[in-house]
Amino acid sequence: MVRVRFAPSPTGPLHIGGARSALFNWLFARRYGGKFIVRIEDTDLERSSRQSEENILAALRWLGLDWDEGVDAGGPCEPYRQTERLHLYRHYAEILLQSGAAYRCYCTEEELAAEREALMEKGETPRYLGRCRDLTPQERARLEAEGRKAAVRFRVPRDRVIQVKDLVRGDVSFECNGMGDFIIMKSDGIPTYNFAVVVDDHTMAISHVIRAEEHLPNTPRQILLYQALGWDTPEFAHVSLILGKDRSKMSKRHGATAVEQYREKGYLPEAVVNFLALLGWSPGGENEVLSIEELKQQFSLEKVSKSPAVFDLDKLNWLNGYYIRQSSLERVAELAVPFLEKAGYIRAPLSPEEFERVKMMVASVRKYLNCMEEVIDHVKIYFTDNFNNLDEDAREVMAGQQVPAVLAALKDKVASGGKLTGAAARAALKEVGKELGVKGQQIFMPVRVAVSGNTHGPDLDQIMAILGKDEVVKRLSRWV
């Protein structure tokens, strides 16, 4: 059975790269009827926090990536936090010590730093040279008598080449001689990443390890550990790095890096998932708008590219705008409410009448939205009538010779009429145009500027209907 995992370290929010890895694992499990497991790698005791863990899990839920086993879900391989599995790592470290595949190392940080510096001065790759590799029992006893605490190092075999058969990158070779014996258990009894991940992936029966390319150099060490413990290795698939549009490593200057930042800006989860899926994977063909169901049916590692993926914020904005326009008006209006409240335009909870007005506003502007945060600026015209700083185009429109007459006639027409609906607004504009012998831009543009302060925006009849009779009369009166 396919069993894959996403194993974040709870040292901060869920970043775009981690979310992409989680999504690829989730899609792979769903495509092949497997299990998706969420494991928390919290052995960095100083930087890990339960709050970060909760934030990561919340981000996964928001994206719709449900897990079959793991934290908050339980399962046959509990526990799913590394700090609750320390007994397992110590058990398997002892097995490696007993077999001679590992040994205790008493070197101090100062000794190791001096060794690294000496190698670098010679132009060699820093690595452990094996000072404690073949200590006699007497030498170990002497070092322990000095009060030195021992770490556990894996004994890397000499003159061997490790072949990694990667489902994305093909065959990759690593020379053991340049590796150096590496620590698997620190002197405080905490496992290192490479050791803990091997024990966890084996005991959780992980079949495929799908992760970022930056983990590829760790893979030969992990394969050596699998072999030393007599375990089968899982399949490996290392997906490409994510770069900015300038082809440099993705950073904050290319856009927000944490998933929760996109949620806070009002991106829709289905748009973010669609976008993430296309970072290094392609379904083939020209269609790039794919639902969750379509992604589950089409995803495969064969179509994951070796080349770096490019994070294109413009593409995400386009996708998100598409999903905003495809969503129900009710949903988009509900998404808009927190932003309008934040701007001070409304105060929740809304009455049914107030929510209907929000729906009308959102309907008038959603074709312009790339993310819901932008609704604040686009509906501003409905909440402010401070048009003192008109742009040059608007001032030019209002300098027209017939503008005062047009606005005065429309003000009287609206004031004497009934409720100002969209249809009533269109009728009033048509009648004024006919009476004064003006049409098209000659009437629509000055009215638009008078009621909204802009020469562009939502349909004029929508603006007038949303503002309502009294507000339209008030705004027109300022120009008469």
UniProtKB/Swiss-Prot annotation:
Compartments, as annotated in UniProt: Cytoplasm
Coiled-coil ranges from the UniProt annotation: none
Ranges spanned by the short sequence motif 'KMSKS' region, renumbered to the chain: 249-253
Binding site for ATP: K252
Binding site for Zn(2+): C105, C107, C132, D134
Cofactor: Zn(2+)
Source domain of life: Bacteria
One annotated Gene Ontology cellular component of this protein: cytosol
The family this protein is said to belong to: Belongs to the class-I aminoacyl-tRNA synthetase family. Glutamate--tRNA ligase type 1 subfamily.
Complexes and interactors: Monomer.
UniProt cross-references to HAMAP family, sorted A to Z: Glu_tRNA_synth_type1
Record's protein name: Glutamate--tRNA ligase
Gene: gltX
